[in-house]
From Swiss-Prot:
Entry binding sites for (1,3-beta-D-glucosyl)n 2: 193, 234, 239
Entry protein name: 1,3-beta-glucanosyltransferase PGA5
Membrane topology, as annotated: Lipid-anchor; GPI-anchor
Gene3D superfamilies: 1.20.58.1040, Glycosidases
């Protein structure tokens, strides 16, 4: 009896241990599943896209895409500038400050921006290689949109020496690539006060060309339709002319027949400082502006406002801008500005330790913005206004008193061509005497000097006559090198001529001229000889890599890619898209296979891993357990017998 009791006790103990182990493992599996689910939920929250509606243009109004409500801009200029003598790492940072690339400052400022009651910030300088995810997503969560300028101080269309070239276009493309995926990006400015008086109205065709080519680029990259417009100064002599010019329809716009590919501005903005102190709708000139734009075909708003002749500023113009009369014409405005600078327009002061102090203007502007609650029309009520055909009489608009001083709009209705980097790469390869890589000088000054000595028709661009040289779209270094090489050849290829007072150099293995280009190609595979002769024939891709030296940039120390277009993150070249899609589909199938519920007779990979990793006694399968029990019972029976 004692032996039998011992055997049965042994069997019960083994069974209990097994059940305890199985129970422990089941508990472990459940805990692991719960932890994994929690982790998955946390990861989903981390990558959850901010719920903010994109803004679109219909007629002369902005609208929220999903709700269909009219959108009024209540914004502030958000741009910090470097102080004189400021020390920073030039190898890692540009010479300007991108306020959306610094999470510390933008998250610090976010509470103040929300308190202010704004729904948009204007950023004048974007660093295209920086990551903007933290700031842009945080702003989106707070319901704040962004209007970004495409230019930066050293790469922009100059009013005194305008060109639309490869360097500027590359810059614009990079900014578009870096910002286009954010839903709270309202749009881009292609220029800011490029034309600011009658003497430089010939710079405006270059801005329209920029609008045209950026729209085309956005379409080619498959981005959503992002509005692109222009910010003008408030010169009473030309503001109506400029407004008419940027929205009228050119012949080339009619040929395209597609709104998203034309050169017309999607919106027009004005930097207005007419309302000072406790002015009025009439005395400030706001009434005249509103009358001027009452039938305008695209949205119009104040890209800057906030006269500071009287301080602290009462910002009484805010009530008028969003009032019953002006809201029918204007889509709001952007107060100038957030950061206190040397010009004393700021509403907050940044201290050296990074802390913020409110200035008196902050609370006043906050009060005005919170009191402004305009209600506009719905998307269904929007009216599409057909823009007029461009002509000097239409642009002059003699019915406007502000343009009476202008005899005529003496600017050609022909725009500069789209910059062709492949052509400029090939031109560079044809030159033997070029601007020295180590030289530091103003390209414009050098060109003025050289063009007194040689004919520069091929690199000149004239917005008044509408004549654009075949190489006028190349960057300043290539244009200057072209003129220097021409002078060098004209003077018998004397080395001292190429030296150009220490600013030029001879490149080895360059004979110069077109005869050297038959076996050279641009970075996109075009034959250089055909390209420069105007044939622009495509060359089949050869097994050997084409000889493509990098295209120089006009800013020394700045890396300039030789490819005609620079892709942004998240976007692949057309030839890579198919491969990427296949890889993504394979990854999705593999993920589904791993996460699917196991069918009868199968074991979940996750369950197997959890059991194997437990501390309790485990068995690989049920057959081993059954065999073990049978052996125990057999031994028990033998002992009893």
């Amino acid at each position: 009896m004692t032996t039998l009791s011992t055997i049965w006790l042994f069997l019960i103990t083994i069974t209990a241990i097994f059940q305890l182990g199985l129970s422990s493992n089941v508990t472990t599996i459940i805990d692991d599943d719960n932890n994994n689910n929690n982790n998955n939920n946390n990861n989903a929250d981390d990558f959850l896209e901010p719920q903010i509606e994109t803004i679109k243009v219909i007629g002369n109004k902005f609208f929220e895409c999903e709700s269909g409500h009219q959108f009024f801009i209540k914004g502030i200029a958000y741009q910090k500038t470097r102080q004189e003598g400021e020390i920073y790492d030039t190898t890692k940072e540009p010479h300007y400050i991108d306020p959306l690339a610094n999470p510390f400052t933008c998250l610090r400022d976010l509470d103040y921006l929300k308190e202010l009651g704004i729904n948009l910030v204007r950023v004048y300088q974007i660093h295209p290689n920086a990551n903007h995810d933290v700031c842009m997503n945080a702003f989106a969560e707070a319901g704040i949109y962004v209007l970004a300028d495409l230019s930066e101080p050293t790469i922009s269309i100059r009013r005194d020496y305008p060109h639309w070239d490869t360097e500027i276009f590359n810059r614009y493309q990079q900014v578009i690539d870096s910002m286009s995926n954010y839903k709270n990006l309202l749009g881009f400015f292609a220029g800011n006060e490029v034309t600011n008086c009658q003497s430089n109205i010939d710079a405006s065709p270059f801005v329209r060309a920029a609008i045209r080519d950026c729209k085309k680029y956005i379409n080619q990259q498959g981005y959503r339709k992002i509005p692109i417009g222009y910010a003008s100064n408030d010169d009473a002599n030309i503001r109506k002319n400029l407004a008419n010019y940027f929205v009228c329809q050119l012949d080339e716009d009619e040929d395209k027949g597609q709104e998203h590919l034309n050169s017309q501005a999607d919106f027009f903005a004005i930097n207005v400082y007419e309302w000072c102190g406790y002015s009025t709708y009439t005395t400030s000139g706001y009434r005249d502006l509103t009358t001027m734009f009452k039938d305008y075909s695209v949205p119009v708003f104040f890209s800057e406002f906030g006269c500071n002749i009287i301080t602290p500023r009462p910002f009484t113009e805010v009530e008028a801008i969003y009032g019953s009369t002006m809201k029918k014409v204007w889509s709001g405005g952007i107060a100038y500005e957030y950061f206190e600078e040397v010009n004393h327009y700021g509403i907050l002061l940044t201290k050296k330790d990074g802390s913020i102090t409110k200035l008196p203007d902050f609370d006043t502007l906050k009060m005005r913005f919170h009191a402004a609650t305009p209600i506009g029309i719905t998307m269904d009520e929007a009216t599409i206004c057909e823009p007029p055909i461009c002509s000097n009489s239409v642009i002059d608009d003699k019915s406007s008193s502000s343009s009476s001083s202008s005899s005529f709009w003496d600017v050609a209705l022909t725009l500069p061509p789209t910059p062709n980097e492949a052509k400029c790469e090939c031109l560079w390869q044809s030159l033997s005497c070029v601007v020295s890589e180590d030289a530091t000088f103003d390209e414009e000054v050098a060109l003025r000097e050289l063009c007194f000595k040689v004919d520069c028709e091929d690199i000149n661009a004239n917005g008044r006559s509408g004549k654009y040289g075949r190489y006028s779209d190349c960057n300043p270094t290539v244009r200057t090198s072209y003129a220097l090489n021409k002078y060098y050849e004209q003077c018998g290829k004397k080395q001292e001529i190429c030296d150009f007072q220490g600013r030029g150099e001879l490149l080895p293995n360059r004979n110069g001229g077109l005869q050297d280009l038959e076996n050279k190609f641009s970075s996109d595979g075009q034959n250089c000889l055909s390209l420069l002769e105007g044939k622009e024939e495509e060359k089949e891709v050869q097994e050997e890599e084409p000889d493509v030296p990098g295209l120089p940039g006009s800013n020394k120390g700045k890396e300039v890619e030789s490819t005609p277009k620079r892709k942004g993150k998240g976007k692949s070249k057309e030839k890579e898209k198919g491969k990427l899609i296949e890889e993504e589909e394979e990854e999705e199938e593999e993920e589904e296979e791993n996460n699917k519920t196991p069918s009868s007779g199968e074991k979940s990979p996750k369950t197997s891993k959890s059991i194997a990793g437990g501390n309790a006694i485990t068995f690989k399968n049920d057959s081993i357990w059954k065999t073990f029990i049978e052996i125990l019972f057999t031994c028990s029976a033998a002992i009893l017998i």
